[in-house]
Amino acid sequence: MRNAIATVLLGLAMLLPVGAVQAQDGPLRIEITDGVIEPLPFAVPDFIADTPAAAQYATDIARVIAQDLVGSGLFREIPKVAYISPYTDFDAEVNFTDWKAINAQALIAGAVSLSGDRITVRFRGYDVFAGQELGAGLQLSGTTDGWRRIAHKVADTIYSRLTGEGGYFDSRVVFVSETGPKNDRKKRLAIMDYDGANVQYLTNSDAIVLAPRFSPTGDRVLYTSYESGFPQIHVLDVGRVQRRVLSAGNGSMSFAPRFAPNGQTIVYSQSQGGNTDLFSMDINSGNPQRLTSAPSIETAPSFSPDGSQIVFESDRSGTSQLYVMSASGGEAKRISFGQGRYGTPVWSPRGDYIAFTKQNAGRFHIGVMRTDGSEERLLTASFLDEGPTWSPNGRVIMFTRETQGASGQARLYSVDISGRNLKPVKTPDGASDPSWSPLQN
């Protein structure tokens, strides 16, 4: 069962033609025929509420779990109108025959109880055709205003048990919220759940903000602000919404920051005297270290997961291309050789791919390549796609898509690394420059 779906994900990652896969330890399966995924059908009845006050939470939690799994593209929810018998008792023995009859290959069952402002959720997953649980049942608790996080955690658990890979639902995205006409657009930092819920604004000035980037622990955000009249790097504590300037003065402009995996070092671009190079800095000491020294423009740096290397874009060859070098500087190796211009590279948290923006023949693309530049694949194509960011499990990419025309509205989209399951991400206003957090604790 788990082997079947894990094999599917491996096939997606390697983009190999995969036929129907039969699990060795049960009948649960996902079919891939000629590169088309056959989502696994599952049922998630409304969770059982112990009191009338818990009823809405029970319904909403089941709904969010289903949305998470369906949104991954690997699962298909069976409509509740197809259920043969109602689900009314969490502790009763499951009637697998009724669920088999509607071809529910997985069943997710749960119960919700309230005590003051606290909510407790118990849940179990079942392999219907094998007639057994998908691992031990679990219990999660929290405050009632955190019920969505509990739902995401349940979905992550089910996703992980069925695929053998980490989930990505209990995560957040920081981005630039855009309002107003194109020639007078207000840009604010905002943060939300990965699915667009619970939007909060982190800045509220008229100064332009760009390129927010999460720390490895998700509690801080680097970004570029024009509050002083020229670009400077700020770091913001998400929980307390406190910020401080990390780069300032000396006639230089600093931008495109990103954290190292250790959370204490940052790498960024600095422009001075008409030249743009890469620098690193310890955020506690504030002492910069030059990493490149060339007459070309070096920008958009991103660390490898182990912190040993940096990928960045440079026009040293005459056009914008991607290069990899040691995190301490030194000789850089070019890894992009296709037609067009490359930019905004970002290393996958798994370490296996680098995502990038490509411009060629009047179109923009989000693509991925191996870390040595091999196996380049373009996942999207439009008037303007740019700025990829990886999900915590390295299987999904979120990016900015801007529409053509006078309004030039920017929105967020996501796509899996096979190029399938392209879809918009819900935001209340225009949105750009996303950065995906790690899974929350």
Curated annotation (Swiss-Prot):
Disulfide pairings: none
Segments passing through the bilayer: none
Signal peptide start-end: 1-23
Subcellular compartments: Periplasm
Main location: periplasm
Region Disordered, residue ranges: 420-441
Keyword Transit peptide among record annotations: no
One Gene Ontology biological process: cell division
Function: Part of the Tol-Pal system, which plays a role in outer membrane invagination during cell division and is important for maintaining outer membrane integrity.
Quaternary organization: The Tol-Pal system is composed of five core proteins: the inner membrane proteins TolA, TolQ and TolR, the periplasmic protein TolB and the outer membrane protein Pal. They form a network linking the inner and outer membranes and the peptidoglycan layer.
Protein name in the entry: Tol-Pal system protein TolB
Phylogenetic classification of the source organism: Bacteria, Pseudomonadati, Pseudomonadota, Alphaproteobacteria, Rhodobacterales
Underlying gene: tolB
